A protein has these predicted regions:
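Beta-sandwich interaction modules
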Residues: 278, 282-304, 423-440
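Short acidic/polar inter-strand loop motif in beta-rich domains
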Residues: 125-127, 317-321, 449-458
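C-terminal GPI-anchoring signal of eukaryotic secretory precursors
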Residues: 603-646
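Short, surface-exposed beta-strand/strand-loop-strand elements in extracellular ectodomains
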Residues: 243-251, 400-411
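Extracellular-facing/secreted segment signature in eukaryotic proteins
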Residues: 15-186, 259-287, 291, 440, ...
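Solvent-exposed, flexible loop/coil segments flanking beta-strands in beta-rich domains
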Residues: 26, 174-240, 320-397, 460-542, ...
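Noncatalytic modules at the cell exterior or secretory-pathway interfaces
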Residues: 116, 227, 301-316, 436-450
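Cleavable C-terminal sorting propeptides in eukaryotic secreted/cell-surface proteins
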Residues: 637-661
Length: 661
């Protein structure tokens, strides 16, 4: 009996080290795959790179490598594994060795084609040269070469080194389930609904196109739940797609049926009848891979009580105004009749895209706020509240920070979501670690911070990417009627912020008072305003003025809110972030595997990754396990250190052997 128990423990221990279910993965280029799983205090990574030279992964807050916190590793010709904590401190792009080595090696080896490293690090290592891993957008940088360094602590081969960077969420990221046999057994049979455009022509010479297509829901006779969706992007169209939004439509069924028989048209033309497509069903933005609903909720497709028609709004962008493409991209929804506990909904909070949203030029920080007032939430959210489980943030080119604030009875709660390193080119759903409860009467604020230093003229709110927007869309359950909760600075507030006292006339409207501005049009005032000296007074007037709330349900404007003009909410207890002192405790010692050249460890490779980037099982050429140490630098050593976990394994082997004898 004892023999079986010990053997089982040994098998489970080894199996647990080699077999990891990764929560996230990203193909950084055709030869570089990174997998990672966030833990409570640290993050575990694995990189699989098609090279037998050195490999590196790093993190920074911008899209350059200067200042990057990097980990570099390789297997040398003597079979020794090297893993080094480095940083890039100047424009040479050469990662320098850190005096503090803060990455913990878990596993590493080579086969005939790939180098594989598995390691972990703290979110905050307390090292000023290391970047904190937070909920912000992180710029992930990578680097690899066909050659290895000549010496462990020396300069890395730089000529022909392959480098790249891309923005990613490392923590608040939707886990994309892999189609393993276990998932297939647990997940019910899914049906798909492809909502695609039909050969939309992007006209040459036009930098923005909003295209709307109405479609009828699938032919189903009972309620289903959408459990995930993803983009379907036509090859060659990716650079021209900014975002796609799927709306529910509930207007006259005959009008919608007529629209569904066409391939679509330009959105929101003045002579078009309103289709009243106000409630968002799904959103895709640049950088997103789609979304998986949590097990307790799904988006309802109901032929009896829900909408039968949907409108796909596609925002095309062509900044060079040189494209003449024909696009058939769209969304793919996966749905099932195995219903989940809750119907999910989308509630969008932000600023109505309108010229009253003004961003002055030449400023490093311009803050704009869109309000979902307590009157809107008080009349639509049940007493038990709603649970927000994911958010997606949206600005155009000037956005640098975004957060969704929550005010309750004069107290500001921690932000529902926040990104102080927002990247407009990467807009992905963030899945919150725990759902956040919103109760009736809560006041929500979508706060966007812009940098307009690159602009010499004002930027106004609007739909074009040259204009700006501020929007945070939340996924929540259970579903309520409220769908769009926007605000807009009132006209008196805008006029006061520009020093205008009175208007006169029409077509065009001109300024009557004060006298020094008399006869100017609004456009002339906006263009001639001295933003450099008057920016602070403009900001104070905007913040202290009134705004118009816009509360939309699937039936139209929420009754009782049509004519409201309200002030900024009174916050008696502002939220203050608590910065805990950094505690640099050593990471738990991890298992490093001691392997011979002929052993097949069952390489921990993503089974669904591209064949060109998959490490083949059982083809180990060299495999190492001890963390190299060259004094304090973590370089190479002529003697192999044996971690305590390896000693435990050795003792277990001896015990098992003795017991069997």
């Amino acid at each position: 009996m004892m023999k079986a128990v010990i053997a089982t423990c040994l098998l489970l221990l080894v199996n647990g080290v080699l077999s990891v279910e990764w929560k996230h993965s990203a193909v950084l280029d055709n030869n570089f795959l990174v997998l990672w799983t966030p833990g409570e205090r640290d993050v575990m990574f694995e990189i699989q790179v098609k090279t037998l030279g050195y490999v590196g992964l790093g993190f920074t807050r911008d899209d350059g490598s200067v200042g990057a916190d990097m980990v570099i590793g390789w297997v040398d010709n003597n079979g020794q594994l090297h893993l080094q904590d480095r940083h890039v401190k100047n424009s040479s792009k050469d990662p320098q060795m850190d005096s503090s080595q803060d990455y913990s090696l878990l596993l590493g080896y080579e086969n005939k084609t790939h180098t594989v490293l598995r390691f972990s690090r703290r979110y905050d290592t307390c090292d000023p040269r290391d970047l904190k891993i937070t909920n912000d957008t992180m710029q992930v940088v990578w680097q690899y070469h066909v050659e290895e360094p000549v010496s462990a602590a020396g300069v890395l081969p730089d000529h022909d080194a392959i480098r790249g960077s891309r923005p990613l969420y490392l923590v608040q990221r939707d886990a994309q389930p892999k189609p393993t046999s276990r998932n297939q057994e647990a997940e019910p049979q899914l049906q798909t609904w492809d909502i695609l455009n039909q050969q939309v022509r992007l006209p040459k010479g036009q930098d923005t196109l909003l295209w709307c297509r109405v479609l009828r829901m699938p032919n189903i006779d009972h309620k289903h739940h959408v459990v995930k969706y993803e983009p379907v992007i036509q090859p060659g169209s990716h650079d021209y797609l900014h975002h796609m939004t799927l709306y529910e439509c509930r207007r006259d069924q005959a009008l919608l049926e007529s629209a569904a028989k066409t391939s679509g048209s330009v959105c929101y033309e003045p002579n078009q009848p309103s289709l009243e497509c106000n409630t968002i069903a799904a959103i895709w933005s640049l950088g997103s891979e789609g979304f998986n609903y949590p097990p307790e909720a799904g988006y309802a497709l109901d032929p009896h009580t829900g909408p039968r028609y949907y409108m796909l709004e596609t925002h095309y962008t062509n900044p060079q105004m040189d494209a003449f493409i024909s696009d058939s991209s769209g969304l793919r929804l996966h749905y099932t009749d195995k219903l989940r506990t809750h119907d999910a909904g989308i509630l969008s909070v932000g600023i109505d895209p309108n010229w009253r949203h003004i961003i002055p030029p030449g400023q490093p920080d311009v803050i704009s706020e869109g309000h979902c007032i307590s009157d809107c939430t008080g009349h639509t959210i049940p007493n038990s509240g709603i649970n927000i489980f994911a958010v997606i943030m949206h600005t155009h080119q000037l956005g640098r920070k975004v957060r969704l604030r929550q005010i309750r009875s004069g107290e500001e709660l921690p932000p529902i979501a926040s990104d102080t390193n927002y990247d407009p080119s990467y807009q992905e759903y963030r899945k919150l670690q725990k759902p956040v409860r919103v109760y009736p009467g809560d006041h929500l604020i979508a706060e966007c911070t812009y940098s307009s230093k690159s602009r010499q003229a004002i930027t106004l709110g609007g739909l074009s990417t040259r204009e700006e927007t501020c929007l945070v869309s939340t996924l929540y359950y259970p579903r309520i009627e409220l769908s769009l909760c926007y605000s807009l600075p009132s006209l008196p507030t805008v006029l006061q912020s520009l020093g205008i006292q009175k208007l006169m006339g029409s077509s065009p409207v001109k300024i009557q008072e004060p006298q020094k501005l008399s006869g100017m049009t609004l456009e002339e005032r906006l263009l001639s305003y001295d933003w450099e000296t008057s920016f602070q007074s403009f900001r104070e007037a905007t913040r202290g003025g009134t705004f118009k709330p816009l509360c939309w349900t699937n039936k139209g404007v929420l009754p009782g809110t049509e004519n409201l003009e309200v002030h900024y909410p009174r916050i008696l207890r502002p939220y203050e972030e608590v910065n805990l002192p950094c505690s640099k405790k050593p990471l738990r010692n991890k298992l490093s595997m001691l392997l011979s050249e002929d052993e097949d460890i069952g390489a921990p490779v993503d089974p669904d990754s591209d064949e060109t980037n998959a490490v083949e099982r059982g083809q180990l050429v060299r495999s190492k396990v001890s963390r190299s140490s060259d004094g304090p630098t973590g370089g190479s050593s002529s003697t192999r250190s044996v971690p305590p976990m390896v000693l435990i394994l050795t003792i277990l082997v001896v015990v098992v052997g003795g017991t069997f004898r």
